[in-house]
Amino acid sequence: RLATAIDKNASKRLELQKIFVWIGRAKHISISDYCDVVVGLDKKSNALHYASLLFLVAAIVFTCVINPVIGIWLSIITYYKFKAGVDRYFICVNHIVKLLMGAGKITALNVDFLEEYNIKLKNITEDLSDIMKRSWLLETGNVDGSIMEMALDYLRMLTHADLIKFNNLIKLFHDKEKRIYELIDTLGFIESSIAIASFRNMLDAWCIPEFKNDSDMQLEVRNVY
């Protein structure tokens, strides 16, 4: 039904396709698989990350007595040690954030034949709004080379802010697991319906199969290849 409605509205289909292109895809990983892992992670203590901050502050405050390089060096070394273990999960969080933003773009279009899904997406994005609020410092590999991005990168290395935020996000992911999968399923259904509508437009003819509970089953097709 949704594919048929999309098929009849070429302009809306194009607008929706642009949003899904903007969302993109996560290369080399399955977001749903990583979501399974993320929600199953145990929340780790941030004690070491806060300790690194204290070392850095102490090195700066007592710069006349202690070489500040020691505090900076310790912060960076411990940062990369822990970052290597969770980097792939950062990508997962970032993609979920993009899905949430994409859901917002779709509902903003106010497409009439998506009314049922718009209501669902609005409820989901409201429930998952904390994920967007808490994930802004997470670096995901999409570095654009800007001065702002470079400054944030140094901030992350020195303060471990992204690692601290990620540890705090783990519990939120666990609590909102059902809603996260509802988001993935709903957007996936809309995108698959767009794909069906687009494929139909490529064909000279197509049909919708009719299933019957008949004891005398027969299959008859023509011009099939």
Language-model segments: which ranges?
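Alpha-helical coupling/stalk and coiled-coil linker elements that connect catalytic or binding modules
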Residues: 1-225
